[in-house]
Amino acid sequence: MSAGKIIQIIGAVIDVEFPQNAVPKVYDALKVESGLTLEVQQQLGGGVVRCIALGSSDGLKRGLKVENTGNPISVPVGTKTLGRIMNVLGEPIDEKGEIGAEETWAIHRAAPSYEEQSNSTELLETGIKVIDLICPFAKGGKVGLFGGAGVGKTVNMMELIRNIAIEHSGYSVFAGVGERTREGNDFYHEMTESNVLDKVSLVYGQMNEPPGNRLRVALTGLTMAEKFRDEGRDVLFFVDNIYRYTLAGTEVSALLGRMPSAVGYQPTLAEEMGVLQERITSTKTGSITSVQAVYVPADDLTDPSPATTFAHLDSTVVLSRNIASLGIYPAVDPLDSTSRQLDPLVVGQEHYDVARGVQGILQRYKELKDIIAILGMDELSEDDKLVVARARKIERFLSQPFFVAEVFTGSPGKYVSLKDTIRGFKGILDGEYDHIPEQAFYMVGSIEEVLEKAKKM
């Protein structure tokens, strides 16, 4: 293959000069003699290409020799990747030796065509009451977990992986994009303890890594998930955190010399997001269900990054700081969270009616809160008092102890089937549990546990 030399280094962006008749293509992988991999982003003319470094550019200098591999970055795929931790290039970082996969795939691939795509409306039960009731997930759908800093995106995601791996025994791919290394480490040990590590492939490009790694690691994970899908499996693809993917794009974009757009984001924000999201789809052979944590800067949902992400999702799970401050976990906001699946034709009339009934009562309670704050409970009509009492029970019943949080809470985790969830909330709406104190509904699984807890009070 052709060889060139480094002529300029600006942080993670490196210019390499090649002979005029052997200029690398955009997205080709280049190898520096020091062992670093570069990816071509732009052809500047005169044989010069501008690349991003997929690794630290420490120690690089002008004049170093660069080889063109002639192909995009390729990563190992298939069952050999299960139970392993890899970096953006698909190299193992868990000190367990080579991956040894029979096949490697390029990380840049075309999205499936219209003919290949399938549209299923099958539900994926998560065992988390508030999600199954208010914003049910579709098999092969896309889910966003929205929340500011520290409201529980990662914990919710870990619980989903644990529940789905154990209850549905499916394969998962987890892409850690620009998140804390400590969380990645905790996550690995959590998976080992739950005995589900052999069903998960882990790909990490964490906070301390250069922007090139964080920008490409989501594509590395997605490529591994696509391989499982094309083998006819139903695979889960988890991304934590999609905002850091956007942020890495912003860093790279500025270094590449592009003009910034709104709030300083890259002008190619919508396109970069689309390239990733359009590949996360289900075909007639298998499905990819994706769960993406979305950090919301300063709790502002109108920020260009979360706003662009919203457009691609089937379900949005919004985590609220106000609910977290009440001590109700998972801190999912039942009035803000949505799902395309919440339709009588998909979930059935009973589920739809119960979910809308729960939202109706909580909305009414929200309106009455101002009156209660000024005039007190005594000024409310009897009907409104009943609404408030039921709403407070519903609020507490939406909380649930998690398996992955047992270490912190000391209470064992609970998995609640969709049938039990609907039955429980229907009972509260119908007034069957009006005589039970609201404390009994807090941090329990099914409605039977509420009755048990009430007996001890």
From Swiss-Prot:
Q: What is this enzyme's EC? A: 7.1.2.2
Recorded topology in the membrane? Peripheral membrane protein
Record carries keyword Membrane: yes
Q: What reaction does this catalyse?
A: ATP + H2O + 4 H(+)(in) = ADP + phosphate + 5 H(+)(out)
Q: Which residues form the signal peptide?
A: none
Per the record, its GO cellular-component terms are: plasma membrane; proton-transporting ATP synthase complex
Q: Which Gene3D superfamilies match?
A: 2.40.10.170, Bovine Mitochondrial F1-atpase, Atp Synthase Beta Chain, Chain D, domain 3, P-loop containing nucleotide triphosphate hydrolases
* InterPro entries to which the protein is assigned, alphabetical: AAA+_ATPase, ATP-synt_VA_C, ATP_synth_F1_bsu, ATPase_a/bsu_AS, ATPase_alpha/beta_chains, ATPase_F1/V1/A1_a/bsu_N, ATPase_F1/V1/A1_a/bsu_N_sf, ATPase_F1/V1/A1_a/bsu_nucl-bd
Q: Where does the UniProt annotation locate this protein?
A: Cell inner membrane
Q: What does this protein do?
A: Produces ATP from ADP in the presence of a proton gradient across the membrane. The catalytic sites are hosted primarily by the beta subunits.
Q: What is this protein called?
A: ATP synthase subunit beta
Upper lineage is: Bacteria, Pseudomonadati, Pseudomonadota, Gammaproteobacteria, Pasteurellales
